[in-house]
Amino acid sequence: AHSVVSRQEILTLAGKPLAKEQFAGVLDQAGGTLLATVLSMLAPDGVAVAAGLAGGSDLPTTVMPFILRGVSLLGVNSVTQPSVTRAEAWDLWATHATRFPWESVTNMIPLAEAREIAPTVIAGATRGRVVVNVNA
């Protein structure tokens, strides 16, 4: 990834069966309207990987991205995977995740600030991830 796009920015295009092609691939942790919208934004032969449903389990989309752009939607089942498979996945992640500038999408806060930022996180108004350092 070379950039981070905010949820709010993506959701401005919600409801469009096809949007401007912006992504070759997407890893979606939200599901729901956010996943439906990024599907409409995939380039031809693009791939979306669904790995969560924090934004909802429904998928309000059309078949247009699938038949007009040939996009694929893959699901990740982490719940029933054996521990050895999970360990292999985490090892792969650790090997390849160092290539991404995580500091650009991560806000590290001490535990003492968690209550203060919680309403912002719940409202979905943060960009990237908020990591709470319980030792700080």
Q: Each predicted region: which residue ranges?
A:
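C-terminal hydrophobic helical "lid"/dimerization subdomain
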Residues: T85-A136
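Short beta->alpha linker loops
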Residues: Q8-E9, Q29-A30, A54, V84, ...
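Glycine-rich phosphate-binding loop and adjacent beta-alpha segment
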Residues: T33-F100, V134-A136
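Glycine- and other small-residue-rich loops at beta-strand/loop junctions that grip anionic moieties
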Residues: A24-D28, A51-G52, S78, E103-N107
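Adenosine-nucleotide cofactor-binding segment
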Residues: A1-T33, D91
